[in-house]
Amino acid sequence: EEDTSIGGGLSQDAAEAAADAEEEEVDADAPTFDRSTLDGIWEEAAYNRQQMVDKITAKVDSGDWGVGSDNVLRGPAGFEVDLNDCPDDWSDTGGISSSEIKIGHTTAQSGNLAAYGNIAVGWDNYLQWINGNGGIDGKNVTLIVKDDGYVAAQTIEFIDELIEAENVFALLTLGSPNSLAVYDKINEECIPHPFIMTGHPAWGDPEIHPWTTGLQMSYSTEAILWGTWIKQNLADMLPVTVAGLVMDNDFGLAYELGFEAYAEGNPDVVSE
């Protein structure tokens, strides 16, 4: 069957099916939550998170997932990471002591995109709450934030510092050009690189970059959703021409290519 996905994102058929679906598939045994209140939303999130943790834990306890005697980490859908390929001095507890878990975060807190620095503020506040409620397994989480100003060259310098001087357990990065500049090294060092704050379709490469995962929807999938919305809501105006104002970097290019790929398969939507 032909793969109709764009850049590894959600396929067009899947996106249109989701848009047309009237009911969301739910666990019949799941409790109901009041989504009209913030407390209800948080309670539902906590429930879903615990369900996920329980399922993962069961898989690890059964031996289906986790690190085997051959030092290979296995997970769902045939996911594998050969830990024998990691640096000789690597440890899966690097950056973790008896009292602390160190996480490094590069982000923009200055320059034209300084508003994105508020994400780091959110992370810090959340981790303060975690620490105030016993931490993680009794350990406090320390977030070391570096302001790269959305400049990839500065990101490289800070990532080197966080790895070599701070010996962090995990790294968080923001920005497509910034993350692309450092994710090769981060994966070579076998350092967890989760929740990248960018939707570039390069993330989600379990073979070459298994330590890197994205935080948000792929920009390629967003392009399909935009195009689907246009076709469904402007049906009486088709064909339509869509103009895009994008940044002149990897971030903007990902958006541009994603929507152009969608438009090529949908002549009623023209990309400019």
What would you call each of these model-derived segments?
Residues E100-K102, T142, V240-T241:
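Residues that mark the start of a beta-strand
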Residues E1-I101:
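Short, low-complexity disordered leader/linker segments with a strong preference
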Residues S98-E100, G138, Y150, E166, ...:
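Extracytoplasmic
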Residues W90, V121-L143, M237, E264-V270:
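Signal peptide-proximal N-terminal region
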Residues G149-F169, T228-L234:
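Short, well-structured alpha-helical segments in soluble
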